[in-house]
Amino acid sequence: MKALAKLKPEEGIWMVDAPKPEMGHNDLLIKIRKTAICGTDVHIYNWDEWSQKTIPVPMVVGHEYVGEVVGIGQEVRGFKIGDRVSGEGHITCGHCRNCRAGRTHLCRNTTGVGVNREGSFAEYLVIPAFNAFKIPDDISDDLAAIFDPFGNAVHTALSFDLVGEDVLITGAGPIGIMAAAVCRHVGARHVVITDVNEYRLELARKMGATRAVNVAKENLKDVMKDLGMTEGFDVGLEMSGVPAAFHAMLDTMNHGGKIAMLGIPGGEMAIDWSKVIFKGLIIKGIYGREMFETWYKMASLLQSGLDLSPIVTHHFKVDDFQQGFDAMRSGQSGKVILSWD
């Protein structure tokens, strides 16, 4: 089968002819329709320090996808041939304390599709049936293909009550932008998102952000004053992993504010803990998606009118995958979709 793989420990992704994956008793075989390129895939392409420590070579990569069930393991119930599915990319052990308590997103033995095991940049993918999620008919293939990062946005945004609250989002990557759209959809008052990438900030404006702030040109506290905010942000969503962005968030949070952190700093990050302590801030780390409450929320948000379509900015045939990676690496894109049909 046709696939995209990390073949060598150097920059790049390569088209290969890979063996069709074999299905176990509890697995589904999925024929891939569309995949999306994740920031993680760009890290793997660039072969940065994280990738060198994490990614086995050679391996088929990719983990954002939608496809059709074409094979069902003999122990599987609840799926049929032809079902349209996406899937949770974190494969969990089922045996640790968190898994047995239903907190599978906190499994300490997680393996990642396209990170630790064969991924979805291929004509066929095998995953445990437990990880598959049926896509409602009224949700497009494009949006189904980005359920994985959309889930990161939903999990982060819905960590705290947002109704009538003022929200600061640091980092206008696709996940941060989708989080802004979610916050507005569920009833936040002001949703302010910060970055230095004008292309992405304009996307955030299209997706409903109250203000999209280029912090290289504008002062965040001036923006707050323009909006009539006198006390600070109630909720912070840190999506960038940039220390300066987190410092700005701590400076502008209201007392008793709540912060959800999805962005991963490049190394250890020193902060002024007195701001956390004296403001009485709550900080919550976010990893992946809650299985499968986040997935149900994603489908429900889209079915209730949340419009994510502007976040998908580029489409390519899989044979033109290099153009897709070039678009993602340029920073001048939202989500990039590769078609496998």
Swiss-Prot record:
Lineage: Bacteria, Pseudomonadati, Pseudomonadota, Gammaproteobacteria, Alteromonadales
PANTHER family tied to this protein: L-THREONINE 3-DEHYDROGENASE
Pfam family, one: ADH_zinc_N
SMART domains assigned: PKS_ER
Chain sites annotated for binding NAD(+): 175, 195, 200, 262-264, 286-287
UniProt protein name: L-threonine 3-dehydrogenase
Record text on cofactor binding: Binds 2 Zn(2+) ions per subunit.
Keywords carried by this UniProt record: Cytoplasm, Metal-binding, NAD, Oxidoreductase, Zinc
Site (Important for catalytic activity for the proton relay mechanism but does not participate directly in the coordination of zinc atom): 148
Family as reported in the entry's similarity comment: Belongs to the zinc-containing alcohol dehydrogenase family.
